[in-house]
Amino acid sequence: MVEVDVAVVGAGIAGLAAAHHLVAAGRSVRVFEGGDRVGGRMASSRVDGWLLDEGAETIAGAGYEATWELIRAVGVPESEVPVIEPGFALWRHGRAHPHLGHPKGLLTGAGLSWRGRWAWLRFVAELGTAWRGFDPDRPETAPSRDATLSEFCAGSAGRQELLAAMLQPLSSHCFGWRPESSAVAPMVATLLSVGGAGARWMTYRDGMDTLARRLAERLPVELGRRVVAVREEAGGGPGSDPGPGGVRAGGVRVEFADGTRVRARQAVLAVPAPLALELRGDDLPDGERPYLAASTYTPMLKVACLLDRPLPSPTRAPSYAVSVPESESRICTGLILDHLKADGRAPAGKGLVSVFASPWVSPELLGEPDERVVETVCAEAERFLPGLRAATVRTLVHRFPLGLPQGAPAAVRERAAFLARPTRLVEYAGDWVMLRPSSEGAVRSGKLAAERVLAHAAGAAAGAEAGAASGTAAAAAAAAAAAAAAASASVGRV
């Protein structure tokens, strides 16, 4: 059986970030990816001169500290991460309104009535008072507790309009959420961390997979290695060889679909929570199961429309994206004009538009043939971007059954206990760990997972030394508890 120091399962940005930080700390890693490329939900593809971002679309200039740390570490120049100059628009009452979520929208309206704008102002004031001191890395501590978006906005006509014309369109378009199923705390935490929906958004000039590709170039990554089970094993005996971190060999068994196995001293599962549940099976500790089970996902389904010409912004003030409220459509939740998002997304004189299926139809359409998905979603999108179908020369459907963390109320309730759990041989990474549905959430979780791996190894080594000196297990237990406390305390610093 092949033996490795730390096995990282999943070569999305969370797994690659974890591997990067572990290597920087002196550990040896091997990354196993079931697919044929790295990036996960940050994957991009190149088709006949078009550059398609299949999953994630943007990063932010503020609130993405962990991402920018990696960008600098791998040597991506800031000039290769341009600012997206156009903004977001809202489709309402038969037309697109610019400045959705941007302070300018208070003046222009952004599709809101005066009552809705007043509710927006009161919401901003509430964030500055009742939410003051709130740590976006700890959404479970929010004043809203586990209230859903719908519950949070109940009680007044103004708040209900704020939901209908801002919070619901943004959450459905960006996260694939339904307001009655997702908690408001993770959304507010995400927006507060970057400075609001009108933040300074950016993208990678060479595709959203840029950072993942650069990281993978520096790491041992094995593609086409689908993992089917991850099991903790009893550690080696007194005569076994401790690894670089002091953890004895044989700690984790990784089983692959082709029947092969790898033994690792420690492991990081950088996969969505539902998949982590499957991989751990009955081996999953009771203290981890509640949060993993509560960390449900929403599917994401979008159609890339390759155009024979660039369609113009739907608003006079340039907008590269249009969010569509549920009240206007339960089929199409939004569009992105990628040729306005960044240069190079389409060949000269051509265009590219991404059409997002709404969370009300995505589950139904996910398993349907491409032709039905395109016909259903793009026919509806024509209402919001006239000329789309006539300009389309080719379509590609991108499906993510496990699209983004749902931010369910149960996950908000269970997260504190999950963070306080002891470190173990198997740790986790993914934006679900941070309860922050974004690439920054994934990167931060990778850094946290690396810290917990190192803390566990340090605790095991200290416990072994203390146990040998004292002849008791109490010292080992104390060292492990200290390692867990240190790792949990690091959440707010990643």
Put a short name on every predicted segment.
Residues 4-31:
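N-terminal Rossmann-like FAD-binding beta1-loop-alpha1 element of flavoenzymes
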Residues 100-102, 317, 334-494:
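Conserved flavin/dinucleotide-binding core of flavoenzymes
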Residues 48-140:
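Dinucleotide-binding Rossmann-like beta1-alpha1 core, especially the glycine-rich loop
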Residues 125-229, 235-237:
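Active-site/ligand-binding neighborhood in enzyme catalytic cores
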Residues 63, 271-273, 431:
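Glycine-rich, N-terminal phosphate-binding loop of Rossmann-like dinucleotide-binding domains
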Residues 23-47:
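Glycine-rich FAD pyrophosphate-binding loop
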Residues 14, 37, 274:
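Conserved Rossmann-like nucleotide-cofactor binding loop
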Residues 228-353, 359-366, 384, 469, ...:
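Mid-domain catalytic core of redox enzymes
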